[in-house]
UniProtKB/Swiss-Prot annotation:
It comes from the Eukaryota. The lineage of its organism: Eukaryota, Viridiplantae, Streptophyta, Embryophyta, Tracheophyta. It is found in: Membrane. InterPro entries: PUP_plant (IPR030182). Keywords: Membrane, Transmembrane, Transmembrane helix, Transport. Belongs to the purine permeases (TC 2.A.7.14) family. Disulfide bonds: none annotated. One of its GO terms (biological process) is purine nucleobase transport. This is Probable purine permease 8. GO terms for cellular component: membrane. It is a multi-pass membrane protein. The keyword ATP-binding does not apply. Residues 373-394 are annotated as: Disordered. It holds the Pfam family PUNUT.
Length: 394
């Protein structure tokens, strides 16, 4: 009995000693771990801030530079389309350097697609749609003032919600309906009120063509976004960072090839030399303008993909929506676009529609996070819940 008591006392002392040591170790680990996440959090928000700047700045810059090209003697719509796409190799570099800081992929990340034909078909279909959208937006930017062009193009949010209703079972909540209505009215005001615009530089027919092409580009962008969401969910069946980046890069590759064919088939390539020589700002500014457009579009794309990776697709879409009203304001300053009452009212309606659209997606994301929060004390639910996140690093 005494031996048993001695053993118990010794074990008790050992346990206390172990507990004391464990507490000290836990305290040390807590101090170290509290500083590590804080440091990582700063770095994450720094990256998010950089990506937000990329989206807002390059979205406006690429549109403004596109108009600068046309204002100073540029006439090739195919060239204006090509520079939107030809910088796609930058995306492969972005993907490579982003992957170097990610953990090693698991076996699930190396899943083979059932058919390379399916994957190729996805890139070709989306690439054709991208080329059509880019060409229509180039024609619209050629014939319309920048402020009018950007406001009409903002209706892409309404088209995105419309196509998502059919392709992705998007629910029409009061905020979405309000956004659809406001953005439609905003664009309609500019379409029906063409008499107030200064159309001295283009004929009435070309102005109408510009409006039709811009609306077509807006609808095409909405269809593309909804279709990509469907493809990632139903066809590719994984929404990883590398999958999204590859999809954007390869569809840009296909679109660039299509536009190059159009450039040579139309014969516009023959006029590029004389266009450069007669460019009002000179030959070097001509090349620099086109190069800057190509770079700014790809930096914008990097910002969009980066925001999806660091935050969510909802946040990325929201930042894109916030940036759209910036272009008309910049256009008034740079190109002295006429800002009449109807255009001001259109901007107000567009901003109201953006806020309604963004707020609904904020509610959706908040609801999604709430539903994915696991109960305290039940760690077995964590792996299953983590599997529901939209974008995973690869």
């Amino acid at each position: 009995m005494e031996i048993t008591q001695v053993i118990y006392v010794n074990d008790h002392n050992n346990i206390e000693a172990n507990l004391t040591g464990q507490e000290e170790m836990n305290t040390t680990m807590e101090i170290e771990s509290s500083s590590v996440p804080q440091s990582k959090n700063y770095k994450k928000w720094l990256r998010i801030s950089i990506y937000v700047f990329f989206v807002l700045a390059c979205q406006a810059l690429s549109t403004i530079l596109g108009r600068v090209y046309y204002e100073n003697g540029g006439k090739s719509t195919w060239m204006g389309t090509l520079v939107q796409l030809i910088g796609f190799p930058v995306l492969f570099l972005f993907r490579f350097f982003s992957q170097t800081k990610n953990p090693k992929p698991t076996e699930a990340d190396f899943r083979k697609f059932s058919s390379f034909t399916i994957l190729g078909s996805v890139y070709i279909v989306t690439g054709l749609l991208v080329s059509a959208n880019s060409y229509m937006s180039s024609v619209g930017l050629l014939y319309l003032p920048v402020s009018t062009f950007s406001l009409i193009l903002a209706s892409q949010l309404a088209f995105t919600a419309f196509f998502s209703y059919f392709l992705n079972s998007q629910k029409f909540t009061p905020f979405i309906v309000n956004s659809l209505f406001l953005l439609t009215i905003s664009s309609a005001l500019l379409v029906v009120n063409t008499d107030s615009e200064n159309t001295a530089k283009v004929s009435r027919v070309k102005y109408v063509i510009g409006i039709i092409c811009t609306i077509g580009a807006s609808a095409g962008i909405g269809l593309l976004l909804s279709l990509v969401q469907l493809i990632l969910r139903k066809v590719l069946k994984k929404q990883t960072f590398s999958t999204v980046t590859d999809l954007v890069a390869y569809q840009s590759l296909v679109a660039s090839c299509v536009v190059l064919i159009g450039l040579f088939a139309s014969g516009e390539w023959k006029t590029l030399t004389s266009e450069m020589e007669n460019y009002k700002l000179g030959k070097v500014p001509y090349v620099m303008t086109l190069a800057s457009i190509a770079i700014s579009w790809q930096v914008y794309t990097i910002g969009v993909v980066g925001l999806i990776f660091e935050s969510s697709s909802v946040f990325s879409n929201s930042i894109t929506a916030v940036g759209l009203p910036i272009v008309p304001v910049v256009a008034v300053i740079v190109f002295h676009d006429k800002m009449n009452a109807s255009k001001i009212f259109s901007i107000i309606l567009a901003i109201w529609g953006f806020i309604s659209f963004v707020y609904q997606h904020y509610l959706d994301e908040k609801k999604l996070k709430t539903s994915h929060t696991s109960p305290v004390g039940d760690p077995h639910l964590l792996p299953a819940e983590e599997g529901h996140t939209n974008i995973h690093s690869v």
